[in-house]
Curated annotation (Swiss-Prot):
Residues 55-68, 119-129, 198-212, 269-357 are cytoplasmic. The keyword Protein transport does not apply. Glycans are attached at N158. It comes from Homo sapiens (Human). This is Retinoic acid-induced protein 3. The lineage of its organism: Eukaryota, Metazoa, Chordata, Craniata, Vertebrata. Belongs to the G-protein coupled receptor 3 family. Expressed at high level in fetal and adult lung tissues but repressed in most human lung cancers. Constitutively expressed in fetal kidney and adult placenta, kidney, prostate, testis, ovary, small intestine, colon, stomach, and spinal cord at low to moderate levels. Not detectable in fetal heart, brain, and liver and adult heart, brain, liver, skeletal muscle, pancreas, spleen, thymus, and peripheral leukocytes. According to PubMed:10783259, expressed at low but detectable level in pancreas and heart. The keyword Membrane applies. The modification Phosphotyrosine is found at Y317, Y320, Y347, Y350.
Amino acid sequence: MATTVPDGCRNGLKSKYYRLCDKAEAWGIVLETVATAGVVTSVAFMLTLPILVCKVQDSNRRKMLPTQFLFLLGVLGIFGLTFAFIIGLDGSTGPTRFFLFGILFSICFSCLLAHAVSLTKLVRGRKPLSLLVILGLAVGFSLVQDVIAIEYIVLTMNRTNVNVFSELSAPRRNEDFVLLLTYVLFLMALTFLMSSFTFCGSFTGWKRHGAHIYLTMLLSIAIWVAWITLLMLPDFDRRWDDTILSSALAANGWVFLLAYVSPEFWLLTKQRNPMDYPVEDAFCKPQLVKKSYGVENRAYSQEEITQGFEETGDTLYAPYSTHFQLQNQPPQKEFSIPRAHAWPSPYKDYEVKKEGS
């Protein structure tokens, strides 16, 4: 039996593509437009990121560029995956949906988690993670979902049966789909918790980055709670399952771009603020001053209160003196102006003898 071609679609087009052009079901065209705009925006950010590398003054912001590029790849994949849910479910779109949905979101949430971990150190004035460590954390966290998805696909498809997803009943398919995303839900909770820790610190400049992650995760959690709730409702019309999932993909993709990518790009070229780091000058750092026992320990002694100072060797310690201590001056040599003296006459004795003779 021949099916009627919907208004807006050309003749000879396969029925699974009708949602892309059917004017009667406008949601497909709307989501297609939103997803296409997201793809273009993501590509624009990815092309802009290498150009901004030379303009980033802060080395710790520059360390995040590879991880943020990986994040943009995940966002680009999310917008691209939206088309797999607009197109009808069959042997090709079924494995794609189950395999890529969790992997792409695990990449995005892992990048946000790695960024949040680095921010928890920066906001407390500690040494941040290196570029390779941040990128390694993001890749490592996302690989777990890859293993889970591959194992599920292989076991479910039994290696060759690609139509198994379309053959499953809608409730069973939805349950398997949500259970497959258990690790992604764990990543979301962990990232949200870690982003809240970025508000606990004395260096407020890095809290703005933490606020971007916190807001992104808060909105993402709201979207996920909404679509999982609708998908698991027993009395809900199952014809809208693809609409719910494709809408969740497009909405979450734009949340990533507007709540995280855009403000982060705006902060990339911001001038390095010295207040965002611990003071490196030793003069300004609090230090342990060597105790001067002659000053502090003798300042309130009863003897010095009465005498005013105490002599120890050649140094006088005053109770409230500075570190320039008083010292005894060496005794000065006495001198006097020479005066004229009358010398006794050599004939004094002679004259006395003469008179006595």
